[in-house]
Swiss-Prot record:
Keyword Metal-binding in annotation: yes
Family statement drawn from the similarity comment of this UniProt entry: Belongs to the peptidase M24B family.
EC number(s) per entry: 3.4.11.9
Database matches in PROSITE patterns: PROLINE_PEPTIDASE (PS00491)
Free-text cofactor note: Binds 2 manganese ions per subunit.
Family matches, as Pfam families: AMP_N, Peptidase_M24
Enzyme class: hydrolase
Lineage: Eukaryota, Fungi, Dikarya, Ascomycota, Pezizomycotina
Full protein name: Probable Xaa-Pro aminopeptidase AFUA_1G14920
Residues that hold Mn(2+) 1 according to the record: D278, E416, E455
Keyword Transferase: no
Role according to the record: Catalyzes the removal of a penultimate prolyl residue from the N-termini of peptides.
Enzymatic reactions: Release of any N-terminal amino acid, including proline, that is linked to proline, even from a dipeptide or tripeptide
One of the record's GO molecular function terms: metalloaminopeptidase activity
Length: 487
């Protein structure tokens, strides 16, 4: 049933297992992705568990459904309570759908039937869940003495009728992580579409922001625009922080008034067919920058982002771009009199710039907004000392880590520099060794700004890069705000 070429299992000379499943006859009709791993096997059974239906605690109301991303990556199925097996030796992909439940069908509508699943998904077999236990038992009886059953987690062991299964719960997860780090054409299209909808929503906010009075209105309009354009789900909780709230990296309360605030940091991205976008724009609550300080910080972050984006290409180490961003930030903050008393390199090595730019420069984007990827087993000796001053591990995601591989064609990464003036961070910095490099009196004048972050999703291409994010920024952003006044 599955299409030829990429949908077949291929075991190469290096024992790479490539599994690509075509999503046919549905709204995507594309490959959802592939799994590549040096499993070193020609037989075995891959077993994946989809997201079950779960109620809220102490409630009869179900939680919103969100498919497990590893399951979706291999199957393309966005239905609850499904299972998937792949018999490597026999090249047999089987989807298990929920058994028919009359009570549920009356209340909620029927679940996916075998016939519907066959028409929608290009798999070899579709069976009801009642067959799952017996099918796995038969596979185990025939093959499990010499072949393993591969699962993602120890908590996802299948039930069988008898006997202990020979399982492996260590190899499949890193194999899928490595595959997900490189996006194919279908995945790039999904991320591009998510960005298209996000750009529409960001633009709509800019057109109307001067008529708004609360952060909640910003969040509401963004959601309304996304849903009305077919993107029901957000890739993450919307961050609409005004004033000092813009200095809170993951501020999601979005419940304060806008009056008297200078800027809004809007970090919001739609999801499209389970694929994320991640977009941040910072804009004034006026037709122009309300203060020279706000303008200067925006232009500094703009420079940080532009200089880093122009250097993205395959073979680049992403952490080197983070170093560059910190160097540009330090130079700019020294010009503004916020950093002082040392050379750029001395200040960078001290870690003082992390008070103002505490997070990583970016991360992978895909089925998760902070997507997974392959990791090097060891970092190059000496790296840790060089990068440690500008790297806060708890606030950094791959590829902004020592274990990250070099950028490769097909990776999608964010570039999201920011400069923040957090009361808490500044108060804590007074107690640290690098305090001598910070002019606290000057820095505290910038606290009303909160923070500025600009974030785009960048595809690494064969010849360099492509910016997938089209949300307005810079002068175009200001022009839209101004036109909104007159409309």
């Amino acid at each position: 049933m599955r299409g030829s070429g990429r949908s077949d299992i291929v075991i190469s000379a290096v024992d790479a297992l490539d599994i690509c499943i075509t999503l046919a006859r549905n709204d995507c009709d594309k490959y959802p992705g592939s799994v590549a791993a040096k499993l070193g096997v020609s037989s075995g059974l891959i077993y994946l568990v989809g997201q079950p239906t779960i109620n809220w605690g102490d409630s009869d109301q179900p939680r919103p459904f969100r498919q497990r991303r590893y399951f979706y990556y291999l199957s393309g199925v966005e239905e609850a309570d499904c299972y998937l097996t792949y018999d490597i030796k026999n090249d047999l992909l089987t989807l298990y759908v929920p058994d028919f439940d009359l009570h549920r069908a009356i209340w909620m509508g029927p679940t996916l039937t075998v016939k519907e699943a066959r028409e929608r998904y290009d798999v070899d077999q579709v069976r009801y869940h009642a067959s799952l236990k017996g099918d796995i038992q038969r596979w185990a009886d025939n093959y499990n003495k010499t072949s393993l059953l591969y699962i993602l987690h120890d908590t996802q062991k299948p039930q069988v009728l008898s006997n202990e299964l020979r399982l492996d719960d260590e190899l499949l997860l890193p194999a899928m992580d490595a595959a997900r780090g490189i996006k194919d054409e279908h995945e790039i299209r999904m991320i591009r579409e998510a960005n298209r909808v996000s750009a529409l929503a960001h633009r709509k906010v800019l057109e109307n922001v001067l008529r708004m009075s609360t952060e909640a209105e910003i969040e509401g309009l963004f959601l309304d625009t996304c849903i009305s354009h077919g993107a029901k789900n957000q890739a993450y909780e919307i961050i609409a922080g005004s004033g000092e709230n813009a200095a809170v990296l993951h501020y999601v309360k979005n419940n304060e008034p806008l009056q008297g605030r200078q800027l809004v940091c809007l970090d919001a991205g739609a999801e499209w067919n389970c694929y994320a976008s991640d977009v941040t724009r910072t804009f004034p609550l006026a037709a122009d920058w309300p203060t020279a300080r706000a303008r200067d910080i925006y232009q500094l972050v703009e420079e940080m982002q532009e200089e880093c984006i122009k250097r993205i290409q395959k073979g680049v180490r992403f952490l080197d771009l983070q170093v560059l961003a910190h160097v540009i930030a330090i130079e700019g903050l020294m010009r503004l009199g916020i950093l002082k008393g040392g050379s750029v390199e001395e200040i960078r090595e001290s870690g003082a710039s992390t008070v103002f730019f505490p997070h990583g420069l970016g991360h992978h984007v895909g089925l998760e907004v902070h997507d997974v990827s392959a990791k090097r087993l060891t970092a190059v000796e000496g790296d840790k000392e060089y990068y440690s001053s500008i790297l806060v591990p708890s606030m950094s995601h791959c590829p902004c880590t020592l274990s990250a591989p070099l950028l490769e064609e097909g990776m999608v990464v964010t570039v999201e520099p920011g400069i923040y003036f957090s009361r808490l961070a500044l108060a804590n910095a007074r107690k640290l060794a690098f305090a001598k490099y910070i002019n606290f009196d000057e820095a505290e004048k910038y606290i009303p700004i909160g923070g500025v972050r600009i974030e785009d999703d960048i595809l690494v291409t064969s010849s360099g890069h492509e910016n997938l994010t089209t949300a307005p920024k810079g002068e175009e952003m200001l022009e839209i705000i101004r036109r909104g006044i007159d409309s």
